Structure formats: C-alpha cells, structure tokens
C-alpha cells in the first residue's frame, strides 16, 4: 500500500511522512482505554511519533488528511467526551468494541465490570449510531469448564442486552498454542485451556447462527482472522478496515 505523504517540521527539521486518510487506533495497544487524552492531543497537534523499542528508530505519522478513524478497544468509554471534537473536525469513526464475558473465569481481570461495559456500549451506539459500534466477542476460549454451550450462554446474555445497539457480531477462536506468552500465562494461572478443532468450530457456528435467528437479533455474523469457511451458517469473514461501512458512515458528510 502506498500512503499519501506530507511534510512536517519538528525542531526546525522538515521531513516527509505518511499522511493517511484512515487511521486504525489501534490493534497494537488499547488507545481508547489507556491513551485517549494523548491521542486527541496528538490529533490536534497534527502528528504522532512512535519509537521502535528494539532499535530506537522513530516513525512519524501526520493527521493532515485524516477523515476517518477505526478504534479498537475493550473499554472505549474515555472516547465519549471526544466525540463532539471528531464531529467538529469532520472526522468519522467506528468502534470495534471487544465485549466479552469472562468475568467469572479470571481471564480478563483488568477490564471494567460487564454491566459498566454494556452501558458504555449502549451510550456509544446512541451517540454514533448502531452501525458504528461493532460487537466483538473475541476470542472464544475453551477450557475444562468453558464449553461451547457455556460460550453460547455468555453470548446470549450480552446479545439480549445489546442486539438493538449494533448491527454486527465478530468473533474468533482462540489459538492458545500459537502464542507462547499467552500459553505460559494460562499454564501459570492454572487454567487448563483446550484448543478448538474444526468440529467444535462448526458446532458453535451452527448454534450461534441459530441463536441469532431464533432471538430475532438479525446481526451480521463474521469471523476475524479465521481460515475456516462458515458461509453455510451465514457467517462471513470480517474486514478489519471495512471500506463499505466507512462509505455508509460518511455518505452524508
């Protein structure tokens, strides 16, 4: 991909830097949860700098051309005060909101209580429109206690609350063995995880699709980063940056 470029001047030094129209903030860290103030300060300043922790090299990005931001977060509540700023600047956004229910499983100890996260989801949906807040139950984790049936119960509990506040549910199947640090943490915490196989993926997909229809949610269902083809269950492959959705959300701007 070739980025648009622009010049910025810092401490008397002028340099050519990328100036994309669309910003992804961010899959590397939860910017909305932990760095919302910093991000919007940099947006106002017009650029950000990132230093590679391994070689110390600095990379810059300009916000001169920014017209749309895709946010990723488990707690986007700190974005709420900044939504008027985005509107004032003519910058659109949508939010990939990871809203899981592992509260009683010691798998997400650093997140806010589920009830508070659900309320944040609803507030964002009311502010931005339900098409602009995507529900991610990500990843789906199997353990000796968490079965596919229990996962479906967890999804149903949340879906009952928020199906009127979103249009889409995205999910993935946890590949614990592919992530050494995650695997080590699970073992250290005494959590006996289980890996997904194709049969269990198909079982969950079929039942999730049925749940979506039976409950009248009518959500678009999609997987994230999964090679398995689940089209027969009306489940598509998600796009991280969805050009069609961005076009919908900016059609009136």
Regions found by a protein language model. Give the residues of each.
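Conserved C-terminal portion of the radical SAM core fold
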Residues: 116-183, 206-216, 220-223
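Short, surface-exposed, charged loop/turn segments at secondary-structure junctions
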Residues: 182-191, 232-240
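Conserved Radical SAM active-site core
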Residues: 1-107, 114, 118-130
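C-terminal accessory extensions appended to soluble enzyme cores
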Residues: 198-253
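Active-site beta-loop-alpha junctions enriched in small/polar residues
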Residues: 28-30, 74, 98-102, 138-140, ...
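Surface-exposed cleft-lining segments at the edges of enzyme active sites
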Residues: 103-111, 139-149, 187-196
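Short catalytic/ligand-binding loop motif for oxyanion handling, primarily in non-cytosolic enzymes
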Residues: 33, 104-105, 141-145, 177-180, ...
